[in-house]
């Protein structure tokens, strides 16, 4: 016998799900121009850019972008946000952009980075208080020298 499990119609798929509370990076667009990202997809360009850092130069759709890869000094087109991850500044005082959560779209400064936890201390522009933000919610921002 093949272990008669009653496999079947338990998982009914419903269209038009009303669960709006799913806060997953897979679905929420977080791409912005001028933020630093790392390529985490081994298949992207046959692995040539795997774990390489770059800067988003153009956001084409909410989930795809063109990235200038530092090491190769070239632009890779149409990378999906699933293929990328955020990069947090190494040093304190680095410019950051909130890419998710309550403060999405706001710029600020990295004050402290705790290597033992997944949180950083940031001060956003026009905010007096220091905020504790999750690493995935902030990203290094490339500020052009004026």
Where are these regions (language model features)?
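Short, intrinsically disordered linker segments that flank or connect zinc-binding domains
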Residues: 23-26, 80-87
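Short nucleic-acid-contacting surface segments enriched for D/E, G, S/T with interspersed K/R
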Residues: 89-92
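Basic/aromatic-rich interaction segments and small domains that mediate binding to polyanionic partners
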Residues: 11-16, 31-78, 94-140, 144
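Intrinsic disorder/low-complexity signal
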Residues: 1-26, 30, 142-146
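Generic preference for hydrophobic/aromatic residues in regular secondary structure cores
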Residues: 1, 84-86, 138
């Amino acid at each position: 016998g093949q272990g008669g499990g009653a496999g079947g119609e338990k998982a009914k798929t419903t269209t038009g799900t009303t669960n709006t509370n799913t806060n997953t990076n897979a679905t929420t667009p977080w791409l912005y121009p001028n933020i630093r990202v790392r390529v985490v997809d081994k298949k992207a360009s046959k692995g040539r850019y795997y774990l390489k850092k770059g800067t988003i130069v153009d956001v084409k759709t909410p989930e795809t972008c063109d990235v200038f890869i530092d090491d190769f000094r070239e632009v890779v087109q149409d990378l999906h946000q699933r293929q990328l991850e955020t990069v947090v500044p190494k040093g304190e005082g680095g410019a950051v952009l909130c890419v998710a959560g309550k403060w999405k779209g706001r710029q600020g400064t990295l004050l402290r980075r705790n290597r033992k936890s997944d949180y950083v201390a940031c001060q956003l522009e026009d905010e007096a208080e220091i905020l504790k933000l999750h690493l995935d919610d902030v990203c290094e921002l490339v500020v052009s020298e004026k």
